Amino acid sequence: MPSSYDRVSKNYRQSELDKFASFTSGWWDPHGPQKPLHALNPVRLDYISKRVSLSGARVLDVGCGGGLLSEALARQGAHVTAIDLVPELIKVARLHGLESGIQVDYRIQAIEDLLAEQPAPFDAIACMEMLEHVPDPAAIVDACAHLLKPGGRLFVSTINRTLAAFMLAVVGAEYVVRLLPKGTHQYKDFIRPAELAAWLRHAGLHLEDVSGMRYEPWRNRARLTARTDINYLACAISPEASHATE
């Protein structure tokens, strides 16, 4: 019976790809348009590195954008494969890799296509600020589960579907403070932790942790918090070998 990950290369919205293609300018400028991502990146890296030994690990970065997290993971000694469907962002990532000397295997590829290649399974998979931008996020989670080694971990960051998230992540960030371009996020696509937990269970993964993540624009810094009503991080583990090899 075909499963959700058999829908190869169909799980995207062209409008989202076009939108992110327009975000390439200044991607690696910590004071530029992607300033919030630069502030979030150390928090994301620390969250991952406390749960996975990165030195020598095989890591997949799904929806890698211009490579901020990909390079940070590689600097910790991980062997990183990074995929995105926006050619302009992969070009940015590759060019920066040439400048930095950090080796990452960047690919213009959907995770469903990568899964179809049946690569060696990964020790860890990162899917950061990506699930809220695809029409079928549960299928992404399912594909990630099938690409993990037994005992491998999936790391997700996304935005909760709450009034607080709408007011701060959409109205505040896009229209008041203008930290992000208008239209970056759609409230209806935000994901409640309970929804993510259900997708993880269905994919055969065990949810280990959910932690809130808060960006403070007045200080341009981010931190973990007990509150998950806006941004949050989650970690899930694959307990069965079948999920990495089927």
Swiss-Prot record:
Pathway: Cofactor biosynthesis; ubiquinone biosynthesis. S-adenosyl-L-methionine binds at residues 44, 63, 84, 128. It catalyses: a 3-demethylubiquinol + S-adenosyl-L-methionine = a ubiquinol + S-adenosyl-L-homocysteine + H(+); a 3-(all-trans-polyprenyl)benzene-1,2-diol + S-adenosyl-L-methionine = a 2-methoxy-6-(all-trans-polyprenyl)phenol + S-adenosyl-L-homocysteine + H(+). The keyword S-adenosyl-L-methionine applies. GO terms for biological process: methylation. Its EC number is 2.1.1.222, 2.1.1.64. It is an enzyme of class 2 (transferase). Pfam families: Methyltransf_23 (PF13489). Keywords: Methyltransferase, S-adenosyl-L-methionine, Transferase, Ubiquinone biosynthesis. One of its GO terms (molecular function) is 3-demethylubiquinol 3-O-methyltransferase activity. InterPro entries: SAM-dependent_MTases_sf, UbiG_MeTrfase. The keyword Isomerase does not apply. Belongs to the methyltransferase superfamily. UbiG/COQ3 family. O-methyltransferase that catalyzes the 2 O-methylation steps in the ubiquinone biosynthetic pathway. This is Ubiquinone biosynthesis O-methyltransferase. The lineage of its organism: Bacteria, Pseudomonadati, Pseudomonadota, Gammaproteobacteria, Lysobacterales.
